[in-house]
């Protein structure tokens, strides 16, 4: 039984983390077959429905469908896999996981923590433990938390510049501009404005940012309100936001954001 093969699906929107987790699992649990890897919640759910894995490693924050919603939908399936949530530290989430004996991994991933997690999963699989009751209770607790807890917005964003990956503090952003399938993030470093790329839609990013700090002023532009120098209107009635010696257009439909009541 020790060498029995089990299957798993990995779901996280960070390619580097998926690669790292896959590599660690190959070392710590060679008999575990990774049957699919997903970059968002929708793809994860499709992969789980197709492969019916024994284990799912599920990131909480993913585009298109978050990990909590994926887990909620898993409860409707005939076979509910063992779920391991992956999360950046969140005291409410961690407390909920521990209360309901649901395993979780904190970012950045720890090899020793993952080894302990794998051992626990193998014990549960050998005992054929049904995870649905604990998972259902956890989903119920998360529903209560989302009604009572203040939303947690992103503090950092991972973005690329050339071949490098950078951590960008959202407070340092000047503005964001949608460019085809990517977003261009702009921030000042020294006396120079630098551009970083993030593969996401503007809608997905806005859902992660504090709406009191980041305003969409145009269908393709979001600005950090705290970085605005001034707002002007030209002779034609067009409104402009001035940030770091730049002029950014404000669409007519969004000019009300800057009206003085």
From Swiss-Prot:
Claim: Transcription regulation is one of the keywords in the record? yes
Q: Record's SUPFAM superfamilies?
A: CheY-like
Q: Response regulatory domain: which residues?
A: 7-122
GO cellular component terms, alphabetically, are: cytosol; protein-DNA complex
| InterPro entries named in the record | CheY-like_superfamily (IPR011006), LytTR_DNA-bd_dom (IPR007492), Sig_transdc_resp-reg_receiver (IPR001789), WalR-like (IPR039420)
Q: Where is the HTH LytTR-type domain?
A: 157-261
State the PROSITE patterns in the record. HTH_LYTTR (PS50930), RESPONSE_REGULATORY (PS50110)
The UniProt GO MF terms for this protein read: phosphorelay response regulator activity; transcription cis-regulatory region binding
Q: GO biological process: what's one of them?
A: regulation of DNA-templated transcription
Q: What is the designated name of this protein? A: Uncharacterized response regulatory protein VC_A0850
**Source species, please?**
Vibrio cholerae serotype O1 (strain ATCC 39315 / El Tor Inaba N16961)
